[in-house]
């Protein structure tokens, strides 16, 4: 987080954190020491471990936030963290999302989000691990040349269109550009993406950074 602050990162979309309620106070204090507020996604099943998967960190000085803006948000699997912020003269909805890796769970989760306007308002800026790609021709390289199982990617794209957003990477580089956020010896994929309003937006995108790197803290 010290590195993020020094490099002027205003928003961090984090997924698959697996932190439970016992981590809330510790993570809140850690973020605030580095100048960030945190929206900590937690599983809404209070009878279980309360583990979550999504977190959203926003730089307090950029958005005129205070420690009081840190919060926990329950959702199915803790997979969504949402914050409405004011930037310049614009109201921005920021959403961190973790889409399930299991194909059946992915389908059910995406269907639930189709009309979830409270957690994911139309025109949001959505950063997430989607566990499927936009276009397997350009977003996947398999060393063995096999077929990538991109199940329910069409549903994912339908949801993003319903939210009036499109892929920021394609906005910047064109829809035939190649890049990968997760790389192994066998496969490279662009699972991690940012979506933003596709028309009538006052935002100008210059660059963004995504990776699938494990963070230990």
Residues of each region from the PLM?
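Generic beta-strand hydrophobic packing signal
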Residues: 17, 68, 83, 97, ...
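Short, charged, solvent-exposed linker or helix-capping segments at domain edges/interfaces
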Residues: 65-72, 107, 204-208
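Surface polyanion/phosphate-binding segment centered on an Asp-His-Pro turn
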Residues: 84-89, 124-127, 187-189, 193-217
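Surface-exposed cleft-lining segments at the edges of enzyme active sites
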Residues: 95-107
């Amino acid at each position: 987080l010290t590195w993020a602050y020094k490099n002027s990162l205003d928003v961090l979309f984090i997924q698959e954190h697996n932190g439970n309620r016992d981590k809330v106070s510790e993570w809140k204090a850690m973020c605030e020491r580095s100048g960030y507020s945190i929206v900590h996604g937690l599983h809404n099943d209070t009878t279980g471990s309360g583990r979550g998967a999504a977190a959203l960190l926003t730089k307090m000085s950029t958005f005129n936030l205070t420690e009081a803006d840190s919060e926990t948000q329950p959702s199915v699997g803790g997979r969504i963290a949402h914050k409405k912020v004011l930037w310049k003269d614009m109201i921005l909805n920021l959403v961190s999302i973790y889409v399930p890796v299991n194909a059946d769970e992915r389908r059910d989760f995406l269907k639930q989000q189709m009309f979830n306007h409270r957690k994911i308002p139309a025109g949001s800026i959505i950063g997430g691990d989607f566990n499927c790609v936009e276009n397997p021709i350009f977003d996947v390289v398999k060393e063995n040349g096999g077929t990538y199982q991109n199940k329910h990617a069409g549903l994912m794209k339908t949801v993003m269109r319903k939210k009036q957003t499109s892929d920021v990477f394609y906005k910047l580089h064109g829809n035939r550009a190649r890049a990968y956020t997760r790389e192994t010896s066998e496969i490279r994929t662009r699972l991690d993406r940012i979506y933003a309003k596709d028309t009538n937006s006052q935002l100008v995108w210059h660059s963004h950074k995504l990776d699938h790197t494990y963070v230990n803290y």
